[in-house]
Swiss-Prot record:
Cited PROSITE patterns: ABC_TRANSPORTER_1 (PS00211), ABC_TRANSPORTER_2 (PS50893), UGPC (PS51315)
Function: Part of the ABC transporter complex UgpBAEC involved in sn-glycerol-3-phosphate (G3P) import. Responsible for energy coupling to the transport system.
Protein name: sn-glycerol-3-phosphate import ATP-binding protein UgpC 3
Catalysed transformations (reactions): sn-glycerol 3-phosphate(out) + ATP + H2O = sn-glycerol 3-phosphate(in) + ADP + phosphate + H(+)
Matching PANTHER family: MALTODEXTRIN IMPORT ATP-BINDING PROTEIN MSMX, SN-GLYCEROL-3-PHOSPHATE IMPORT ATP-BINDING PROTEIN UGPC
Pfam family of the protein (one): TOBE_2
GO CC, one annotated term: ATP-binding cassette (ABC) transporter complex, substrate-binding subunit-containing
A GO molecular-function descriptor: ATP binding
Record SMART domains: AAA (SM00382)
Broadest EC class assigned to this enzyme: translocase
């Protein structure tokens, strides 16, 4: 196990900056998730940590050692990829043993590590099968097993669940978290899926345009997004972003007090209600556009007042709202997130 320090790391492709100066410390045994949209620099950053990309500026330390010039094999890390990267002509056992054999590990030690990984991942009955005989989830377990047998200082996961269907992704997400907690191995995990990030991470690193927008626990990032980007990216459905003029047009908003510089308010779908709450709220005229039943609750899409501003509410059950019906929507004042659209940052 080890700490990982990323110190003012930059990556340029010619004149194009891909990573624009990242500073991050990963504690021993911590699982950090890099999350953001395609092109934000998260996979590039991971590949620089792994040694698969050169670093333009700055440096990476693993267990206190500057590894900028170290080969990937000499960084004491193990990587799990999206595409499994298994040798098709080898059995599961052969895939698990291959790297250890190449390093000259003794046979008794190889047997011990393979047996331990097989037990942890519950792949013992599959050891003599070829990858083509396995399901996607089983192949990903084998890929993780190949990382485990190395007993590295750190695991690096590069979107390992992207090829799996929705049900299997949920199952493997739980297995990865359970595995990491059992092994207590420092881990960095890359994904574009914010739900995956929220459920796996000790801390999230939200990236955008080659920069870090926010670092924090999943709960802290969700409850207090630092920027308009984070507010719109983290959460499903995402936070509603409403111009202050739309809110102030409501009679009940005349005394609404917000920090100086606020011109945009964020409201989570559960901060908008169709019945008046006991706490302070702003009543808004709304027109129903769409109702999406999603099981035990529904997503209600409405247009506010005479504007073109649409918002999404999370409402219990399957309410009977007709399309184009006029309804009242109540915005909880205590759940408002104040932002400035010029800076993109919070104002409180």
């Amino acid at each position: 196990m080890a700490t990982i320090n990323i110190i003012d790391v930059k990556k340029n492709y010619g004149a194009v900056p891909a990573v624009k100066g990242i500073n991050l410390s990963v504690a021993d045994g911590e699982l950090i998730v890099l999350v953001g949209p395609s092109g934000c620099g998260k996979s590039t950053l991971l590949r620089m940590i792994a040694g698969l990309e050169t670093i333009s500026e700055g440096h990476v330390e693993i267990a206190g050692r500057n590894v900028n010039k170290a080969e990937p094999a000499d960084r004491d890390i193990a990587m799990v990829f999206q595409n499994y990267a298994l040798y098709p002509h080898m059995t599961v056992r052969g895939n698990l043993e291959y790297g250890l054999k190449n390093r000259g590990t003794e046979r008794a030690e190889i047997n011990r590590r393979v047996a331990e990984a097989a037990e942890i991942l519950e792949i013992g009955p599959m050891l003599d099968r070829k990858p083509r005989e396995l399901s996607g989830g089983q192949r990903q377990r084998v890929a993780m097993g190949r990382a485990i047998v190395r007993e590295p200082a750190a695991f690096l996961f590069d979107e390992p669940l992207s090829n799996l269907d929705a049900k299997l992704r949920v199952q493997m997400r739980v297995e990865i978290r359970r595995l990491q907690r059992r092994l207590k191995t420092t881990s960095i995990y890359v994904t574009h899926d914010q739900l995956e990030a929220m459920t796996l991470a000790d801390r999230l690193v939200v990236m955008n345009g080659g920069l870090v927008e926010q670092v924090g626990t999943p709960v802290a990032v969700y409850d207090r997004p630092a920027s308009l980007f984070v507010a719109s990216f983290i959460g499903s459905p995402p936070m509603n972003l409403v111009p202050i003029d739309v809110l102030r047009a409501a009679d009940s908003a005349s005394s609404l007090a917000l920090p100086a510089g606020t011109d945009m308010v964020g409201l989570r779908p559960d901060a908008l209600l169709v019945t008046k709450p006991a706490e302070p709220s702003v009543r808004l005229d709304a027109t129903v556009e769409l109702l999406e039943p999603i099981g035990g609750e529904s997503h209600l899409h409405v247009r506010l007042g005479g504007s073109q501003q649409t918002v999404v509410l999370t409402v219990p059950g399957r309410p009977d709202f007709a399309e184009n019906a006029n309804i009242d929507v109540f915005a909880r004042v205590g759940a408002m997130h104040p932002f400035n659209s010029d800076t993109g940052k919070r104002t409180d």
